[in-house]
Amino acid sequence: MIELSHVTKTFGSATRALDDLTLTVPQGAVYGLVGSNGAGKTTAIRHITGIFRQDSGSVTIGGLPVYENPAVKSRIGYIPDDLGVFGGGTLRELAAFYRTMYPRFDAKRYAALRDVFRLDEATPLRRFSKGMQKHAAFWLTLSLRPDYLVLDEPVDGLDPVMRRQIWSLALEDVAGYGTTVLVSSHNLRELEDICDHVGIMHMGHMLLERSLSDLQDNFVKVQLVTENPLPQSLQILHESTLGRVQTLILRGDPQTVADELAASAPMLCDLLPLSLEEIFIYELGGTGYDVKNLVL
């Protein structure tokens, strides 16, 4: 389990990147970390991987502190958004380095993945395209057989075939080895396909986190036609009207919403599920984030 408890991090004298952040990734989960630009997602990830030390609060993996703990760090596979950390080495040189640094490096898996990624192992990574560098990063990281796979915008710039191949490999590790995955991405539709838990961050703190199924069961889109007032008990996040048809985004489980709307005797009442992208937009809209005029 990955746990951040009441974590605060300030850079300089005024910039508070994390503000009492609490985040929990259950063991064996595929957790999608999403948020507005500048929400603090990458800063949170750099605490999880032991790069940053928190000002206050705690950061633990498996109940153990991460910062300056090589035993815990050796169980983490991390792919950052910026791959400049690879420098000018070749894949072959980096694989040899990983073997010395990570006791769990699996040479057989590294060899097996050669047919998946098909990269020249004698070419310096700086000569690879951005997409090829991502391929190399996944090749090396998946060869670690990590207990915890932490990914920051991992498939940005990859073609659809390779994206699907990489997610398939990662999910095989989740199913076969109990790997815990945390992935930060702005591609919410893709996250919806692979994640079972979601956390939404804004301005350094967590707005909400829960399983994806629970999250989607607590928001509903309604299209209705009624001549009667709507019940005051409805928790309306957004509403719009086109002709006689009202479209409402509501917080609440579908059955409760349907029962409440029945009191207004609607002539038409269709309840529709919300996508993760829609939930993200309307949840942030409630914080004052400038998304109030977006309608999906």
What are these regions (language model features)?
Residues T49:
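Helix-to-loop junction immediately C-terminal to a conserved catalytic motif
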Residues G57-V72:
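Conserved ABC transporter NBD signature motif
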Residues P80-A136:
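ABC-family P-loop ATPase nucleotide-binding domains
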Residues L149-E153:
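Catalytic Walker B motif of ABC-type/P-loop ATPase nucleotide-binding domains
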Residues I166-P254:
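ABC transporter nucleotide-binding domain
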Residues V220-L296:
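Short, charged/small-residue-rich alpha-helical element at the C-terminal edge
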